[in-house]
Amino acid sequence: MFRSLAGIVLLLGFGSAFATTTGVAFVHGTGQQTDAYNDYWQPAMVNSVRQGLANQANYVVINCDFGQYMWTSGAAGCLATQLTNFITTKHIDDLVVITHSNGGNVMRWILSNPTYDSRYPAIIKATRWVNAIAPSSAGTPLANAVISGNVFEGAVGWLLGYQSDAVRQQQTSWMAVYNANNLLGTKGRPALPKGFWDVVGSDVVSSPFNSDSYCGGYTLNVGLEVTQAWLASCSDGFIECTSATAAGSLWFYDHNSLGGKYLSHNQSRRACFGLDVVLRNDL
């Protein structure tokens, strides 16, 4: 209901006096990407979502080094550069940002710190809202495990990386400090200047006898089933539900909007179970 009301308010605000140019940006999660279109999101996801645009060319797939701390030039600086270029060249004034995992933290840094970089205010102004898929807003215990260097590190390195700055940042205790001092949108903090809508994956399906296990890659879902054992019962194998809902506002839990289907952390960046259609219709 709140999401619908927000959309109505935006429409009333835009009015009919001028036309807007809508665009969509796909912002990847932890790690360095050079071809996130093919490697992170995959074409089926991107090309399905952008069908919701009046001009399907008005999209950008971000490629940055999110192995760095969120505020660095390689992370938020890189994101600001690519978003600014996109907004400027395509004349975008109604930007929907779709983030996944740690990408939500990088985008939230921009929204929370408009004076940190002279480009941030224009990005914030152009942004309609952020659709934050499985954001690690309160960190993840898996980052704690990797940084502690225990034997579990070998099992999650493929997913999270090995003791990078971004992994250090996503330790639960570190994110608590950032949320209390540097980032907006969590409980007890001022609201973000634009909507930050959480899409929450709440379970992992990995049975070889269940066809749901194969969407996005069976072996990846099996790996997330293993990592889920380290997390709360409500998790996507990487992010606990409490972390995914820690900042901004809840949009939906997977099974409530996808016909009872669950999204693992891998599946929530792919065209699985109609997620792409929900995101498309939001544009």
State each model region's role:
Residues 1-4:
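Positively charged n-region of N-terminal signal peptides that target proteins for export
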Residues 14-16:
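N-terminal signal peptide c-region/cleavage motif recognized by signal peptidases
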Residues 20-95, 148:
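Active-site catalytic motif of lipid deacylating hydrolases and related acyltransferases
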Residues 23-27, 59-62, 96-98, 106, ...:
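Structural recognition of the beta-strand scaffold that forms the well-ordered cores
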Residues 30-32, 66-67, 102-104, 136-138, ...:
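Short, solvent-exposed loop/turn segments at secondary-structure junctions
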Residues 38-39, 140-146, 208-215:
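Short aromatic-enriched loop/helix-cap "lid" or pocket-rim segments at secondary-structure transitions
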Residues 76-182:
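Serine-dependent carboxylesterase/thioesterase catalytic core
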Residues 189-283:
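C-terminal catalytic-base region of ester-bond hydrolases, centering on the histidine
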